[in-house]
Amino acid sequence: MKEKILLVDGYNMIAFWQETRQLFKKSELDAARTILLEKLSHYASFEGIRVICVFDAQYMPGIRQTYEEFQVQVVFTAEEETADDYIERLAAELNTPLHQVSVATSDLNEQWTVFAQGALRVS
């Protein structure tokens, strides 16, 4: 059985979710990220999947960071790297017979790129 992995474009999701959109607009990013990660944790537990949530460094400059919070793998990209770039590369790496990769983003260009790599879209 394939391991199901969901890759999430964190700030894209925050900007479009009604529950977090106002926090994003007010630059209350810590609160918005916490809400998103809690929701993703519940979703991961319910679905029995691994979730990797990627945030652009443009909102949190510095070196790439990876850690786990609420049972979700959290990645802040390197300063010159977008979440889209990271997700595209990771989707290609994880697209093996052992994994079923899905991507959650509203970015159409990102969707087409990951479709071409064999990943699925979650909306």
Regions found by a protein language model. Give the residues of each.
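Nuclease catalytic cores that cleave nucleic-acid phosphodiester bonds
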Residues: 3-8, 12-123
